[in-house]
């Protein structure tokens, strides 16, 4: 699992960005090295996804303002909301299926338009 931060710069995320960039490099290397063995490798780069981590972060860092901050974070996405874990899972399931048998060495942004539509 990669992240959109490997596509766009985000303040104060040096180590996280570097590790997600490494996931991309690993994805491409595995795809190239094992293509003749029938092994496919792709990466998925989500943007903000509404998980319990987000709720916990907001409650710890913005007590009493969780709803306001959640709304603010959601509005940074061009679609106006965070992704849902099931949406990420559906993409991963597709990439693992035979229906995606012609896809390898690719990264898939699943970000509500964040990378391409935010002017980054």
Where do the language-model regions lie?
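Short, flexible catalytic-loop segment of classical short-chain dehydrogenase/reductase
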Residues: 46-56, 60
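Residue(s) in the substrate-gating loop at a strand-loop-helix junction
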Residues: 3
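Alpha-helical segment proximal to the catalytic Tyr-Lys
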Residues: 32-36, 101
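Short C-terminal tail/terminal secondary-structure segment
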Residues: 8, 93, 104-120
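Active-site helix of classical SDR
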Residues: 19
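A short C-terminal helix-loop "cap" of Rossmann-like NAD(P)-dependent dehydrogenase/epimerase domains
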Residues: 59-76
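A conserved structural motif in NAD(P)-dependent oxidoreductases
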Residues: 64-65, 77-88
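Conserved SDR Rossmann-fold cofactor-binding beta-strand/turn motif
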Residues: 40-50, 96, 109-111
């Amino acid at each position: 699992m990669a992240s959109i931060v490997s596509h766009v710069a985000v303040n104060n995320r040096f180590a996280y960005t570097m590790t997600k960039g490494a996931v991309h490099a690993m994805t491409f290397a595995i795809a190239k090295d094992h293509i003749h063995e029938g092994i496919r490798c792709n990466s998925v780069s989500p943007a903000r996804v509404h998980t319990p981590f987000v709720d916990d972060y907001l409650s710890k860092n913005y007590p009493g303002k969780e709803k306001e901050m959640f709304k603010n974070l959601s509005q940074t996405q061009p679609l106006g909301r965070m992704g849902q874990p099931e949406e990420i899972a559906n993409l991963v399931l597709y990439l693992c299926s035979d229906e995606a048998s012609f896809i390898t060495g690719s990264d898939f942004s699943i970000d509500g338009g964040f990378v391409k539509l935010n002017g980054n």
